[in-house]
Every structure is written in C-alpha cells, then in structure tokens.
Amino acid sequence: MFNFLRTDPTPGMTAAQAIPLVEAGEIVLIDIREPMEIAMSGKAKGALAIPTAALAMRADPRSPECLAELKSGKPVAVYCASGARSSMAKGMLARMGHEVYNIGGLAHWQQAGGAIER
C-alpha cells in the first residue's frame, strides 16, 4: 500500500561498508539533501553536497558543469535524510553510467561510526 515510501530494498552497500572506502578515497560520497538540511545537521565527512535538483547538471560526465570527482570513474555512494531521495538519485546516477550505491540516510552514517562535518 505504501510502496512509494520504501527505500531501495537492495542498496548493495551499507554505510558501515562505505566509511572506510570514503576514507581511502576509493568511492565518491554524495549528500543529496538541500543546503538548509545540511546547515542544520552537518554532512558526512568527505561528502560532496549536491542537492537533488542540481544532480543532473553536477554529476553527468557529459555536462560541462560536472564535478571532477564524478569524472573519475570511481563508484558513488549517495545518502539523504532517510534513504528515500537517495534511492531516486541512485537511479538517476546509474542512468548517467555511474556505479552507484544508496547507503540510506545521514543517521545510518552516524550509527555506523561515520564522522560529521559542520
């Protein structure tokens, strides 16, 4: 009945698995929340802040606005507040050709021991 509320059922990577990969520079981490959300709670250490509305422009390797980190060919992990928006972002990034994982929400990152930047 409420399938639209479900997050990605098969993320392929947990926040706990992503933490050492981000620290080692082996994966690109993207926070897709809005700037006001990030200002209120901080973001995962090492994450790029790219709100959902800017994702197509900033993450598509064919776009002149694409960030250099997203032209590297490295896998990408995305998160939001709960995992729902990052599930949608995962699909968008996959269509752009990225290997992408939804690691859920910022709370998942924190619960796994991930550091927060303010």
Please state what every model-predicted region is.
Residues 1-27, 35-75, 86-118:
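Rhodanese-like catalytic fold shared by cysteine-dependent sulfurtransferases
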Residues 31, 83:
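Conserved G/P- and acidic residue-centered "switch" motifs that form tight phosphate/ATP-binding loops
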Residues 79:
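Short, surface-exposed ligand- or partner-binding patches at beta-edge/loop junctions that are enriched
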